[in-house]
Structures are given as structure tokens and as C-alpha cells.
UniProtKB/Swiss-Prot annotation:
Recorded metabolic or biological pathway in which this protein acts: Porphyrin-containing compound metabolism; chlorophyll biosynthesis (light-independent)
Chief place where the protein resides: plastid
Keywords of the record: 4Fe-4S, ATP-binding, Chlorophyll biosynthesis, Chloroplast, Iron, Iron-sulfur, Metal-binding, Nucleotide-binding, Oxidoreductase, Photosynthesis, Plastid
Protein name: Light-independent protochlorophyllide reductase subunit B
GO cellular component, one term: chloroplast
Known function: Component of the dark-operative protochlorophyllide reductase (DPOR) that uses Mg-ATP and reduced ferredoxin to reduce ring D of protochlorophyllide (Pchlide) to form chlorophyllide a (Chlide). This reaction is light-independent. The NB-protein (ChlN-ChlB) is the catalytic component of the complex.
PANTHER family linked: LIGHT-INDEPENDENT PROTOCHLOROPHYLLIDE REDUCTASE SUBUNIT B
Organism: Metasequoia glyptostroboides
Assigned protein family: Belongs to the ChlB/BchB/BchZ family.
Amino acid sequence: RRLLRDLNIEINQIIPEGGSVKDLKNLPKAWFNLIPYREVGLMTAMYLNKEYGMPYISTAPMGAVDMAEWIRQIQKNVNTLALSLSSKRVDYEPYIDGQTRFV
């Protein structure tokens, strides 16, 4: 959560944590899904991708290299989806550099 906050990304839902059946209606509102653990949530993400065209990221952000790749995938999804709303793009490379510089 902290990392997403650092990137100014608002979390729509965390499923199953604290979720209820009535919260499920909000799932299609997300721009994309993050699946930090492939064992949990991958089938749901695949379903949402099939039904709603919602992309998902299933790279586990464990270690500096995977975390950097995870953030780059987030950046790619945000920039792709933001094109329809604005010409503004995000660049998370300075954040990645700051987080991985001394590793």
C-alpha cells in the first residue's frame, strides 16, 4: 500500500481483505488489477480481463529487480489507460532509481 501511495495510485478494492459481496460491484471500476501472489487472485484477474478487458499485473514485487519490473508494468498500464483521459503521462523511473540505488 505504501508503495502505491508513493506513486499516487488510489486503491479501489483489496480482495479478499475486508471485502464483502456488495463490494464486488466496484471491481470493474479499476483500471487494472495487481496480483502480488499468483496463488491468490490470479483466476479472478483472468476472469475480469476476459469479461471487462481489465489488464492485470501478476509479477510478485519481491526483491529490487522484480519490484522495479512491477512498477514499470504499473507505469505502462497507467500511461496506456490515461491516454483516453489526458495527454499527461507518469514516469516512475526516478522513484525506481531512488528505491534501488543502494541495493
